[in-house]
Regions:
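Active-site helical microenvironments for divalent-metal-assisted chemistry
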Residues: 1-302
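Single conserved hydrophobic/aromatic residue that forms the stacking wall/gate
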Residues: 301-310
Length: 310
C-alpha cells in the first residue's frame, strides 16, 4: 500500500505552528521508514504520525511535533544526526537524541526501589521536559497497539515497565489522563481476567445508575446556582486499574467501593471551595471519615474530597 506523501493529522495543525516544516518532517520520516512495518502490518510511519497527533492534542510547539515524527529515525533507520540538524535545526536534533537515549535504557524491573531509581534516572536524562513528553506519547501509542506483539512474555514485560515506570512519571507531570490510560492498558495485559470482570461490573453500574448520577449533578448545580456560586461540575468515573488498586490496598470487595462515580466541582477561589462544602454538607450527610482538607495542608492539588450518602 502506497503511503501518502501529505501529512494528515487527526486535527488541523494550529496556525501558530510551522506547518510547512512539519510537512517536511513527515515526508522525511516517510522516506526513512518506507520499507518498515509495524507488528500490525501497517506501514511503520503510522506510529510516528500517531505520536505526533498525541503531541498536537497537547498543544506543543513545532519542534516537539517534528520530534514526534522523527523520534525513531536515528535508532531504527539510516538517517544521520547531520541530516536532521541540517533539515530541521539543532533544537530538533537535541530532542530526537534525547528520546533515542531514553529508548535505550533497560528499565524493566520487578523491584519497587529499582523502579523509583529508573524514574529518577529518566527525569535526570530529560533535561528538556519535551523529551519526556515525546517518550510518553510514544509509549502511549505503543500500549494502544500492544495486542499486535505476538510474544506474550514481551507484552507482559512492556506492560510491567509501563505500569512501574511510565504511568507514575505521567502522574508526576500532572498528565493524569495519560497516567490513567497507561495503567488500564497495562492492567489489561497483566491481569486480563480481573480487568474484564471489573469492566463488566462498571459498565453495568453506568447503565443502572445513569439517571441517578445525572439527577444528582443537576441538583448540585441548582443548589449552588441558588447560592450564586460560579463553578463547573465535571463527572468522574474511577478507572479500572484504580478500582483494582483500591480493592487490593484496602482489602475490600467491589460492592464496598463508594467512589466509582464522583463529581469534581471546580471554582474560582479557596473561599468558594469552603462555601460549597458547607452548602452540600447542609443538603446531604457526609460519610464519617471521608473528608480530607488538602487546602489547609498545602497539598499539590487544592481539593476538599468528601463522600456523601445520597
Amino acid at each position: 500500500m502506497a503511503q501518502s506523501t501529505v501529512y494528515k493529522p487527526a486535527k488541523p495543525i494550529d496556525k501558530n505552528l510551522d506547518s510547512k516544516l512539519i510537512e517536511k518532517a513527515y515526508s522525511f520520516a516517510v522516506e526513512c521508514h518506507k520499507s518498515q512495518k509495524r507488528h500490525s502490518g501497517d506501514p511503520y510511519i503510522s506510529h510516528p504520525v500517531a505520536v505526533a497527533d498525541i503531541l498536537l492534542n497537547l498543544k506543543l510547539d513545532t519542534s516537539t511535533i517534528i520530534t514526534g515524527l522523527l523520534h525513531d529515525t536515528l535508532e531504527d533507520t539510516l538517517a544521520t544526526e547531520n541530516e536532521i540538524e541540517e533539515k530541521f535545526g539543532k533544537e530538533v536534533l537535541q530532542l530526537v537524541n534525547g528520546v533515542t537515549k531514553l529508548s535505550k535504557i533497560e528499565t524493566y524491573t520487578e523491584n519497587k526501589f529499582q523502579a523509583e531509581n529508573f524514574r529518577k534516572l529518566i527525569l535526570a536524562m530529560s533535561k528538556d521536559i519535551r523529551v519526556l513528553l515525546v517518550k510518553l506519547a510514544d509509549r502511549l501509542h505503543n500500549m494502544r497497539t500492544i495486542q499486535f506483539i505476538p510474544q506474550e512474555k514481551r507484552r507482559q514485560r512492556i506492560a510491567s515497565e509501563t505500569l512501574e515506570i511510565y504511568a507514575p512519571l505521567a502522574g508526576r507531570l500532572g498528565m493524569h489522563e495519560f497516567k490513567d490510560e497507561l495503567e488500564d492498558l497495562s492492567f489489561q495485559i497483566l491481569n486480563p481476567s480481573a480487568y474484564s470482570s471489573l469492566m463488566t461490573r462498571i459498565e453495568y453500574l453506568k447503565k443502572d445508575k445513569s439517571n441517578l448520577t445525572d439527577k444528582i449533578k443537576t441538583r448540585i448545580f441548582s443548589l449552588l446556582e441558588k447560592n450564586e456560586i460560579d463553578c463547573q461540575i465535571i463527572g468522574r468515573e474511577k478507572k479500572i486499574f484504580s478500582v483494582w488498586n483500591k480493592m487490593q490496598n484496602k482489602q475490600i470487595a467491589f460492592r464496598q467501593l463508594s467512589d466509582i462515580f464522583a463529581y469534581r466541582i471546580i471554582t474560582n477561589s479557596i473561599e468558594d471551595c469552603y462555601s460549597i462544602l458547607g452548602i452540600i454538607h447542609n443538603r446531604w450527610s457526609a460519610v464519617p471519615g471521608s473528608f480530607k482538607d488538602y487546602i489547609s495542608v498545602s497539598y499539590t492539588h487544592l481539593t476538599l474530597p468528601t463522600i456523601y450518602s445520597v
